Each structure stands twice: as structure tokens, then as C-alpha cells.
Design a protein with these regions (language model features):
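Active-site Tyr-X1-5-Lys
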Residues: 86, 99-137, 154-165
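Conserved Rossmann-fold NAD(P)-dependent oxidoreductase catalytic core, especially the SDR/UDP-sugar
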Residues: 35, 61-103, 117-127
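Short alpha-helix in the Rossmann-fold core of NAD(P)-dependent oxidoreductases
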Residues: 38, 48, 53-60, 76-79, ...
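Conserved active-site region of classical short-chain dehydrogenase/reductase
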Residues: 18, 57-65, 113
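A hydrophobic alpha-helix adjacent to the NAD(P)-binding/active-site core of NAD(P)-dependent oxidoreductases
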Residues: 9, 52-53, 67
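Short, conserved active-site loop motifs that form the nucleotide-linked donor/cofactor pocket
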Residues: 6-8, 126, 168
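Conserved Rossmann-fold cofactor-binding substructure of NAD(P)-dependent oxidoreductases
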Residues: 8-32
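Short alpha-helical oligomerization interface
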Residues: 42-59, 92-100
């Protein structure tokens, strides 16, 4: 069943603590925060470490402080399978030790650690989702990314939903 009145999409700079707390105070009875805010380009993260650390890690820290202040008890965090890096044993499962090999992955792992600290202290309940991209982007069924085009499955899905492109091809 559709409940558009039960959800609020809020776009703001998580490092702006005053605005963040103001928004959370305005939306009473928040059951759960879905935290998808992050920069996510691996190549760019190597060139702009401070930008990625401040946005992804410091932003998450600000959000955690704000949800504690505002009494929100649940968070679902959009992490990344990139935190696993290169593993000797395949397939990778969630018990694999993280071995981040990019600054982007490092920021996701640090954010997970910060969230876990809050959860272990009893402040929040938390789930971190470590996404893999299981969908081939090439018609020969190869897991391949063409970096000259959007490589974000969600952005393509949204383009289809907004009728900006006709079809989503999954191979």
C-alpha cells in the first residue's frame, strides 16, 4: 500500500547541524532515518580525500548526533561492498574482514564503525547495507561499467520512472 504522507525526502548538508536539527524537530515521530547521503565516485575520492571524508564521515557523525538529540531510534545506512576490497575467498559474505582499497571505501567503513558505536552503546538500532552491483551493464552479460555513462543503477531506475528514458535494460 502506498503511503506518500508517511515519508519525507529531505536534502540538506548534514554538516549544517543547526539546519539538520531544525528539520528533525519539524518532523515529529520519525521512526527511522534512511541515510543515503554520500559522495560515491571512487576515482574522485582518490583526488579529493578531504572532501569525501568531510562529506561522508563528518556528515554521518553530525547525523548521528542529531538523531540522538531528537530521540530517533533507528537508522538504515547505505554502505557499500567496496569496503571488502579484494578478497581471497569468493563469494564474499558479510563475515569477510573489510579491506578497503579506496578512499571512498574507507569513508564508508568509518561511517559504519561510527554507527555501530552508537548502536552498541544502546543509543540507536542500526543496519548497514553493503551493496554489490549484481546487474550486468553489458549485453554480453559481463559485469562491466562504462564510466562515460551513468554507472548508478538507482539513477537509471529513476530516469525510467520519470520517463526520461524508455526502458531499463538488465542483462
Amino acid at each position: 500500500q502506498n503511503h506518500p504522507d508517511k515519508f519525507a525526502f529531505i536534502e540538506l548538508d548534514l554538516q549544517n547541524k543547526a539546519e539538520l536539527n531544525s528539520v528533525l524537530r519539524q518532523h515529529k515521530n520519525i521512526d527511522c532515518v534512511l541515510h543515503f547521503a554520500a559522495l560515491k565516485s571512487v576515482p574522485e575520492s582518490e583526488e579529493k580525500f578531504d572532501l569525501y571524508w568531510n562529506n561522508n564521515v563528518k556528515g554521518t557523525e553530525s547525523l548521528l548526533e542529531a538523531i540522538e538529540i531528537n530521540g530517533i531510534k533507528n537508522i538504515i545506512f547505505s554502505s557499500s561492498a567496496a569496503i571488502y576490497g579484494e578478497q581471497d575467498i569468493q563469494p564474499i559474505n558479510e563475515e569477510a574482514e573489510p579491506k578497503p582499497i579506496s578512499n571512498y571505501a574507507l569513508t564508508k567503513l568509518q561511517s559504519e564503525t561510527d554507527i555501530e558505536d552508537y548502536a552498541l552503546s544502546g543509543i540507536i538500532n542500526a543496519i548497514s547495507l553493503r551493496y554489490f552491483n549484481p546487474v550486468a551493464s553489458h549485453e554480453d552479460y559481463v559485469i562491466y561499467e562504462d564510466y562515460t555513462k551513468s554507472n548508478n543503477l538507482m539513477s537509471v531506475i529513476l530516469q525510467v520512472a520519470k520517463k526520461k528514458i524508455d526502458v531499463l535494460k538488465i542483462y
